[in-house]
């Protein structure tokens, strides 16, 4: 298994008691995309990017739809606003935590 400690550390900056199994599941879900700097980050200022997060991970993996997904995404953007480079893994973890759908990951 790959060393995901960098992701655990980043998630730990925003969430207490990190569920490493959930982080591992997100890393596996994202797969090879995490190798690309651009694809490994989420831009909260780009509505197209947030739409992809909503229609992809939030909908397909977490089962969120419509307003519930949009509210959770907005809450995560607010929580991470001081971090200029928002890690996709951390963003997805916080999205699951915010929406109460962590069980879909671990």
Located regions from the model:
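Residue-level detector of well-ordered alpha-helical segments, enriched
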Residues: 22, 26, 49, 68, ...
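Short amphipathic alpha-helical segments and their helix-coil junctions
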Residues: 4-13, 65-82
């Amino acid at each position: 298994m790959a060393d995901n400690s960098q992701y655990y550390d980043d998630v730990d900056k925003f969430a207490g008691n990190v569920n490493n199994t959930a982080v591992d599941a997100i890393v596996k879900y994202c797969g090879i995309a995490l190798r690309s700097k651009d694809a490994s980050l989420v831009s909260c200022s780009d509505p197209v990017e947030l739409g992809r997060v909503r229609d992809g991970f939030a909908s397909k993996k977490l089962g969120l739809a419509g307003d519930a997904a949009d509210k959770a995404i907005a809450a995560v953007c607010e929580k991470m606003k001081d971090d200029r480079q928002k890690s996709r893994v951390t963003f997805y973890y916080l999205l699951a935590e915010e929406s109460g759908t962590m069980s879909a990951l671990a």
